[in-house]
Amino acid sequence: MQREHKTHNKLSFIYITPLYISPINQTRLTYLSSSFLLSSSSKMCLSSSETFSDTPTRLVLYLKTQSHVRIPRLSRRRRMWREEKKMEMINLKLYVENQNIIRENEKLKKKALLLHQENKTLFSLLQTKKLSSVHK
């Protein structure tokens, strides 16, 4: 942005560059301004950090909207990536836990089968003893 001021036969050009755009306070913007004072006898350059309450230029508005669009997208992408990684870890833990439960279940099934077979044999032995005691 360029502003032209005429003061006491001196022509000064002020180049204003946005230094920082505050997302919280959008009415006042901080600019870095460089003032070039030109006269026939001397050339002078002044730099200062000033605050202007002017309406921002199109470039400043564009930069503001771009920063507001990029930052949430990036943070949203990072947040989604972290949540996906967290979900993957939870899924992996649940998978391992399920595999352990399945193995334990198989062991218990084998044990139940052996106990059932033992119960059958004991029951058949009991039946044979009852039959032999009845026949005596």
Curated annotation (Swiss-Prot):
Q: Which UniProt keywords apply?
A: Coiled coil, Transcription, Transcription regulation
Q: Known InterPro entries for this protein?
A: ZPR
Expression tissues? Expressed in the adaxial epidermis of the cotyledons and in the vascular cylinder of wild-type torpedo stage embryos.
User: Is Protein transport tagged as a keyword?
Assistant: no
What induces or represses this gene? Up-regulated in response to increased HD-ZIPIII activity. Up-regulated by REV.
Q: Which residues form a coiled coil?
A: 97-122
One GO process term, biological-process aspect: leaf shaping
Among PANTHER family, the record links this protein to: PROTEIN LITTLE ZIPPER 1, PROTEIN LITTLE ZIPPER 4
Function of the protein? Competitive inhibitor of the HD-ZIPIII transcription factors in shoot apical meristem (SAM) development. Acts by forming non-functional heterodimers. Part of a negative feedback loop. Essential for proper functioning of stem cells in the SAM.
> Subunit composition?
Interacts with REV.
Q: What is this protein called?
A: Protein LITTLE ZIPPER 1
The species is Arabidopsis thaliana (Mouse-ear cress)
Q: Which gene does this sequence derive from? A: ZPR1
